[in-house]
């Protein structure tokens, strides 16, 4: 079958032919319709330090997708041929303390689709049926294809009560923008997002944020004053991994504020711990999506009127995959869809 794979330990990704995956007793086989390019896929393309330590070569990559069930393992219940599905990209063990305790997203033995095992940039994907999620009929293929990153956004945004709260999102990548849209949709008062990329900030404005702030051109304190905020932000969502952005977020938080961190900062990042301690801030790390509460919330948010369509900015056939990766690497894109049909 046709697949996109990391074939060489160098920059790039290549179209190739690989054997169709084998179906296990507890698996389903999915014929891929659409995939989306993740920031992780760009890291793998760039062959950065993380990729060199993590990705075995060769490896079929990709983990954002939607498709149709075409084969079912003999032990599988609850799925039928023809079901439209996406799926959780973290394959968990089922027997560690967190899995058995209902905290499956924190499984210490997690294996990543398209990272540690063959991924979705292929004509067919096999995953455990446990990981598959049926897509409701009133959700489009394109939106279903970005459920994985949308889930990161939902998990981060819904970490804390948002109704009537003021929220600061640092980092206007696609996940940060979707998180900001979720906050606004569920009842936050002011949702402010910061970045230095004007293309992405314009995209955030289209998604309905209160203010999209280029911190190279505007002072965040001035924006807060303009909005009538006198005590700081109640909730902070750190999506950038950039130390200056996190420091600015800490400085802008209200006393007793709550922070969810999805962005991965450098290991040697320094911050003013007085901001954390004397403000009594609560900081929560975010990994993946809660299985599967986040997935049900995703579907419900879209069905209740949350419009994510502006975040999808580019569409290519799979044979034009290089243009898709070029768009992602340019910084002037939202989500990029690759069509396999």
From Swiss-Prot:
Purpose: Catalyzes the NAD(+)-dependent oxidation of L-threonine to 2-amino-3-ketobutyrate.
InterPro entries cross-referenced by the UniProt entry: ADH-like_C, ADH-like_N, ADH_Zn_CS, GroES-like_sf, L-Threonine_3-DHase, NAD(P)-bd_dom_sf, PKS_ER, Zn_alcohol_dh
Active-site feature positions: 40, 43
Site (Important for catalytic activity for the proton relay mechanism but does not participate directly in the coordination of zinc atom): 148
GO cellular component, one term: cytoplasm
Predominant localisation class: cytoplasm
Keyword Cytoplasm among UniProt keywords: yes
Biological process terms in GO annotation: L-threonine catabolic process to glycine
Key word Cytoplasm present: yes
The protein's name in its UniProt record: L-threonine 3-dehydrogenase
Known catalytic reactions: L-threonine + NAD(+) = (2S)-2-amino-3-oxobutanoate + NADH + H(+)
Binding site for Zn(2+) 1: 38, 63-64
One Gene Ontology term of the molecular function aspect: zinc ion binding
EC number: 1.1.1.103
Pathway: Amino-acid degradation; L-threonine degradation via oxydo-reductase pathway; glycine from L-threonine: step 1/2
Binding locations of Zn(2+) 2: 93, 96, 99, 107
Keywords: Cytoplasm, Metal-binding, NAD, Oxidoreductase, Zinc
Protein location: Cytoplasm
NCBIfam families (UniProt xref): PRK05396.1, tdh
Amino-acid positions noted as binding NAD(+) in the UniProt annotation, renumbered to this chain: 175, 195, 200, 262-264, 286-287
Cofactor binding, note field: Binds 2 Zn(2+) ions per subunit.
Cofactor dependence: Zn(2+)
Organism: Yersinia enterocolitica serotype O:8 / biotype 1B (strain NCTC 13174 / 8081)
Superkingdom of this protein's organism: Bacteria
């Amino acid at each position: 079958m046709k697949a996109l794979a990391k074939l060489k330990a160098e920059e790039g990704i290549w179209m190739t032919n690989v054997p169709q995956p084998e179906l296990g007793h507890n698996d389903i086989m999915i014929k891929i319709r659409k995939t989306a390019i993740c920031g992780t896929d760009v890291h793998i393309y760039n062959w950065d330090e993380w990729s060199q330590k993590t990705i075995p070569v060769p490896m079929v990559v990709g983990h954002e997708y939607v498709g149709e069930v075409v084969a079912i393992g003999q032990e599988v219940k609850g799925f039928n041929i023809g079901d439209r599905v996406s799926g959780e990209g973290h394959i968990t063990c089922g027997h560690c303390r967190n899995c058995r305790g209902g905290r499956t997203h924190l499984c210490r033995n997690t294996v990543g689709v398209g990272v540690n095992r063959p991924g979705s940039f292929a004509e067919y994907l096999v995953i455990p049926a446990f990981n598959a999620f049926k897509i409701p009929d009133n959700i489009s293929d394109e939106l279903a294809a970005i459920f994985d990153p949308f889930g990161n956004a939902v998990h981060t945004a819904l970490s804390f009560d948002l109704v009537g709260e003021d929220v600061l999102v640092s980092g206007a990548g696609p996940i940060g923008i979707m998180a900001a849209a979720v906050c606004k949709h569920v009842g936050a008062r002011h949702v402010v997002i910061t970045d230095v990329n004007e293309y992405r900030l314009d995209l955030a404005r289209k998604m309905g944020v209160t203010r999209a702030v280029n911190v190279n051109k505007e002072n965040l304190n001035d924006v807060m004053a303009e909005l009538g905020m006198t005590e700081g932000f109640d909730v902070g969502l750190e999506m950038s991994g950039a130390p200056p952005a996190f420091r600015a977020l800490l400085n802008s938080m209200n006393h007793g504020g709550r922070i969810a961190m999805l962005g991965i900062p450098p290991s040697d990042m320094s911050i003013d711990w007085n901001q954390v301690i004397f403000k009594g801030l609560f900081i929560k790390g975010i990994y993946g999506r809660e299985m599967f509460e986040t997935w049900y919330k995703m579907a419900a948010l879209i069905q209740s009127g949350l419009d994510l369509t502006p975040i999808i900015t580019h569409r290519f056939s799979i044979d034009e995959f290089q243009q898709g990766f070029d768009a992602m690497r340019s910084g002037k894109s939202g989500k990029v869809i690759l069509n396999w049909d």
